[in-house]
Each structure stands twice: as C-alpha cells, then as structure tokens.
C-alpha cells in the first residue's frame, strides 16, 4: 500500500526489511501491511511563549520575563530528523512544544540569574543572543532547531523598573536643565565677549585713527615749516636779486649818463674848436683872438667841470639809493630772522637765552678788555703775600670773566651752569 505526506511532516517505516527504519520527509512510500508499520511526525514550526515569572536576578531583584521562540525540525537534515524521531516519535505537537518550552524556560531562568535588571532591560539584544545560543545546542540534540528568539516583555512587581525610569527621567530632566543653563550661560558669555571685542575693536580703531591724525598733523607741521622756510628763503633771494638788479640798472643808467655827458663835452669841445677856426679865419687882432680863445677855453673847462661834478653827484645818488635798497632788504631778512629767533626763544626759553648770551660773551669780554688794550703801561704793586707780575694780572682778568655768569644771572635770572646741566 502506498502512503504519502506533505512537506510539513515526515513518515517513519519500520518492520520487515526496514532495519534501520526508513524516514521520508515530504514524499511517498510503499508499506507491506501486517509486516511493516508506518508512523507520522509533524515538521510544523512551533511558536513558544517562554514566560519566566519572578526570577531573581544577580542583585536579587525578582523580575518576570517573557520571550517568543520559533522552533522547527529540519526535514532535510537526516541527523536532526533521526534524533527527533528517537525523542518524540509517537508524541503530539503539544507534547513536543511543552518539552521544548520547559527547556527554553530553564535556560532563560539561568541567564536571568546571571544578569542585572539593567542589563536585561537596556541590552535586550544581548540577552536574546545568550538565550538563543545556550538553548540552540540542547534543542539541536533533540532534533529541534531554534529559528529565532526575541525578548517580548520585562516587568516586576516591586516597581524597580518604574523607579529606574523615574531616576533616568529625572537625570535626563536634570541634564536638560543643566544643559539649558550652560547654553544660556555660554550664550551670555559669548554675547559679552562679542560686545567686549566690539568695544575693544572700536577703541583700537579710534586709537589708530588718533595716531594717524597725530602723525598727519606732525608731518604737516614739519612740511609747513619746510614750505615756509623755503618760501622765506625764496622771497629773501628774490628781494636780494631785485635789489642787485636795480643796483645794476642804476649803475647802467649812471654809465649812460656819464657817456651822454662825455658826448656833450666832446660836442662842446668840437664847437669851441669850430669857433676857434672861425676866429682864426676872421680878421682879428692876434691879441684879441688869443684873449677870445683863452676865454672860450676857460668857459669850456668850467662847463666840463660842472658837468663832471653833476655826473659824479648823480652817480653817488644812484649808488646810495641802490645801497639803501639793499640795506632795507637785508634789514627785512634780519627782521624775519629775529622773529624766528623770538619764536625759538619762546619755545626753548632759558636754553635760547643762554645760547644768545653765549654768542654775546665774546663781545662782552672784548668790551671789558678794551681799557686794558688801550693801556700803555701797567704798574703792579704787591704786599708780598700774593702773586705779582703777569700772573696777578691774568688772575684778575680771570676773576672778572668768572664773575660774568653770576652777573648775567643777576641781570636776567638765568643760571648758565644750571641750564647747561639740565640740557
């Protein structure tokens, strides 16, 4: 007789000529009645709800864990099929499921006892992998393959997990408040730093602008001084050149006038000569002619002297005017120089006054020594306790010179030695 089975079950034929028994998964077989026996075993996937109630963890906290496991007998694996037939042949699916469930539940309890609540709750994947690994080896020996295992639920009756959640929630809220406060603090600090940097940058910019303005004013003042100096020098040079030119023009005019006067004298002389010839040509007495000639010569000499005197006077006048203009230009230049010296004296005060005094000291010494230079004879009288001769005279002159700074200080209030030390 032929028997068939679907892919979700297997047939085991034993008896006459079937040693060892034949196992067929999803196929057909011929069985001799009365001498051979056929038995069926299910290959369906089993879904097990593995529940462990009040299992004590490593820290002694009782928890209840529920897992979902998928079991299956691999019909193509002859070794697993033979093992299952040896273990479960003749048993129903519920019996097989109960045995597998008890095995899984025992491994699940053992693994829970070695872990803490936090490890089970927070790392479910690790817990599932451990249960799957431990249970797979035992169930494989029974001919059952663990397809999958998933941790479904973890809870306890002591509100331990709830307390963990509260603590975690409080910690998260605390961290959130701390983070918010830190962010606000950092924002305020960054804003203050930004304001400080802005103000510092503004002040630095103003300082740089002030420095640039100061440098500009200083350079402009220097350039203005140079320009004014050059202008003054140019004006002085121009005025001197104008004075020289005017003087040259006046000299040329005087030379022209002298030449004109000379020409006039020559013309007069020629006229006198012509008249003399006329006299000679005329019939006159020699004496009268000689007298007339002498008179004319005297007249010509008189006119010549008058014209020469007038020319000399005009030349002297022109030269005087030119020299007066030159002296006037020089006076203006010296006045400008004195004005600049006055500005320098105003700026440097005592130093400038000392400088002026030092320039005039030689003149003062010269004036002091003038009486001595006019002395023809000096008679030295000594009482016997002091120097005599030239040494005494030199010493007295030196005493006079050394008293000059003291005299200047009394007259002007400026100490030459004090200014020299501070300068």
UniProtKB/Swiss-Prot annotation:
One of its GO terms (cellular component) is endosome. It is found in: Cell membrane; Endosome; Membrane, Caveola; Melanosome. Signal peptide: none annotated. It is a peripheral membrane protein. The keyword Membrane applies. Its main location: membrane. Induction: By optic nerve injury. It comes from the Eukaryota. Normally expressed in growing retinal exons of newly differentiated ganglion cells at the retinal margin. After optic nerve injury, expressed in all retinal ganglion cells and retinal axons. Also expressed in endothelial cells, spinal cord, larval and adult skin, muscle processes, thymus and gill macrophages. Pfam families: Band_7, Flot. GO terms for molecular function: protease binding. One of its GO terms (biological process) is positive regulation of cell junction assembly. Keywords: Cell membrane, Endosome, Membrane. Disulfide bonds: none annotated. Heterooligomeric complex of flotillin-1 and flotillin-2 and caveolin-1 and caveolin-2. May act as a scaffolding protein within caveolar membranes, functionally participating in formation of caveolae or caveolae-like vesicles. Belongs to the band 7/mec-2 family. Flotillin subfamily. This is Flotillin-1. The gene is flot1.
């Amino acid at each position: 007789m032929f028997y068939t089975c679907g892919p979700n079950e297997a047939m085991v034929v034993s008896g006459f000529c079937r040693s060892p028994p034949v196992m067929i998964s999803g196929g057909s077989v011929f069985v001799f009645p009365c001498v051979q026996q056929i038995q069926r075993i299910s290959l369906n996937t089993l879904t097990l709800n593995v529940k462990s109630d009040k299992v004590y963890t490593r820290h002694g906290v009782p928890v209840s864990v529920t897992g979902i496991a998928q079991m299956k007998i691999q019909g193509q694996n002859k070794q697993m099929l033979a093992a299952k037939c040896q273990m479960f042949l003749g048993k129903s699916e519920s019996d097989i499921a109960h045995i597998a469930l008890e095995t899984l539940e025992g491994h699940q309890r053992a693994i829970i006892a070695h872990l803490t609540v936090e490890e089970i709750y927070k790392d479910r994947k690790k817990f599932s992998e451990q249960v799957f690994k431990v249970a797979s080896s035992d169930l494989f020996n029974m001919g059952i393959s663990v397809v999958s295992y998933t941790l479904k639920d973890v809870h306890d009756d002591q509100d331990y997990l709830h307390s963990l959640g509260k603590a975690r929630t409080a910690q998260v809220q605390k961290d959130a408040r701390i983070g918010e406060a830190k962010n606000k603090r950092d924002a305020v600090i960054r804003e203050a730093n930004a304001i400080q940097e802005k103000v510092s940058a503004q002040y630095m910019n103003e300082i740089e602008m002030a420095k640039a303005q100061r440098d500009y004013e200083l350079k402009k003042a220097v350039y203005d001084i140079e320009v004014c100096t050059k202008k003054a020098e140019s004006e002085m040079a121009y005025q001197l050149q104008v004075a020289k030119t005017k003087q040259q023009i006046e000299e040329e005019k005087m030379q022209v006038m002298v030449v004109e006067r000379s020409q006039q004298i020559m013309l007069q002389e020629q006229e006198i000569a012509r008249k003399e010839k006329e006299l000679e040509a005329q019939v006159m007495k020699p004496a009268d002619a000689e007298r007339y000639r002498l008179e004319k010569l005297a007249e010509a000499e008189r006119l010549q002297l008058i014209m020469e005197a007038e020319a000399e006077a005009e030349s002297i006048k022109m030269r005087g005017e030119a020299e007066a203009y030159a002296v006037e230009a020089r006076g203006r230049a010296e006045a400008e120089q004195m004005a600049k010296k006055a500005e320098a004296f105003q700026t440097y005060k005592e130093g400038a006054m000392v400088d002026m005094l030092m320039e005039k000291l030689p003149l003062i010494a010269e004036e002091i020594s003038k009486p001595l230079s006019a002395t023809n004879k000096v008679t030295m009288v000594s009482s016997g306790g002091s120097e005599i001769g030239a040494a005494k005279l030199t010493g007295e002159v030196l005493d006079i010179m050394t008293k000059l700074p003291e005299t200047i200080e009394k007259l002007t209030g400026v100490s030459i030695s004090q200014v020299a030390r501070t300068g």
